[in-house]
């Protein structure tokens, strides 16, 4: 079973958000990295780009497939995880430590449409 962490918010497209104050750290879940296999490239937006909940903001490529990244929240990108540009495989080592973007949240009600750890675990078991 893939690792799921309590206190995070999860989307049906297998992205997570870790909220700290007015900011959200967005990445792919352990379930997603397991399904993708060895990650070889992460396409990320630029700092100051706007992301919109439910819309694409980048992609993750692995040796098996490419997968669009769908933002679970809306806001402004304030930081990207630059380490992933040179070492994208860190996502496979720990998807939750190796977030992709940090977003200044523009509408925290976006979180109401996401799953908690229990709901996400059940979703993945379907």
Model-derived regions: residue spans:
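Acidic, low-complexity mobile loops and tails
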Residues: 1-56, 93-126
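Residue-level recognition of beta-strand microenvironments
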Residues: 17-19, 63, 80
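Short, charge-rich, low-complexity interaction segments located
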Residues: 77-80, 85-93
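Short, Lys/Arg- and Gly-enriched loop/turn segments at beta-strand edges
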Residues: 59-70, 87-89
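Short, glycine/small-residue-enriched coil/turn segments at secondary-structure junctions
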Residues: 2-4, 66-73
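Conserved hydrophobic positions within beta-strands
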Residues: 14, 60, 69, 74-77
């Amino acid at each position: 079973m893939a690792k799921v962490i309590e206190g995070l918010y999860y989307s049906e497209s297998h992205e997570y958000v870790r909220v700290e104050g007015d900011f959200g750290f967005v990445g792919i879940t352990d379930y997603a990295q397991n399904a993708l296999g060895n990650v070889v490239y992460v396409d990320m937006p630029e700092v100051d780009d706007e992301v919109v909940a439910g819309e694409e903001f980048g992609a993750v490529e692995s040796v098996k497939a490419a997968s669009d990244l769908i933002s679970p929240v809306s806001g402004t990108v304030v930081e990207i995880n630059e380490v992933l540009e040179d070492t994208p495989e860190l996502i496979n080592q720990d998807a939750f430590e190796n977030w992709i973007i940090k977003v200044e949240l523009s509408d925290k009600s976006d979180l109401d449409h996401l799953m908690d750890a229990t709901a996400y675990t059940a979703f993945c078991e379907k």
